[in-house]
Amino acid sequence: ASFBZAPAGBSASGEKIFKTKCAZCHTVBZGAGHKZGPNLHGLFGRQSGTVAGYSYSAANKNKAVNWEEKTLYDYLLNPKKYIPGTKMVFPGLKKPZZRABLLAYLKESTA
């Protein structure tokens, strides 16, 4: 399903998804250091590959995508297809509900 057809997200469900599938490599806490992946605090409205102190792949820097709900929804379906050459090893979330839930959580937790 495209972003326009995405269901409304549930942030409580999204938090569970984040903790089980994302938190090993990412944090959302303001001022926290990077893990295997960059800190996601301030994610919305930010350009890919621009967080200070994190070593991004050239692919992430060169993609120069602005992270918003639609771009993240598409990216999270298949990160390696969206940004070929990304270091992110996560295969993606195939279910539209899971992507919508994760985005609802990220919107709240990274602001």
Curated annotation (Swiss-Prot):
Heme c binds at C22, C25, H26, M88. InterPro entries: Cyt_c-like_dom (IPR009056), Cyt_c-like_dom_sf (IPR036909), Cyt_c_1A/1B (IPR002327). SUPFAM superfamilies: Cytochrome c. The modification N6,N6,N6-trimethyllysine is found at K80, K94. Binds 1 heme c group covalently per subunit. PROSITE patterns: CYTC (PS51007). It holds the Pfam family Cytochrom_C. This is Cytochrome c. It comes from Nigella damascena. The lineage of its organism: Eukaryota, Viridiplantae, Streptophyta, Embryophyta, Tracheophyta.
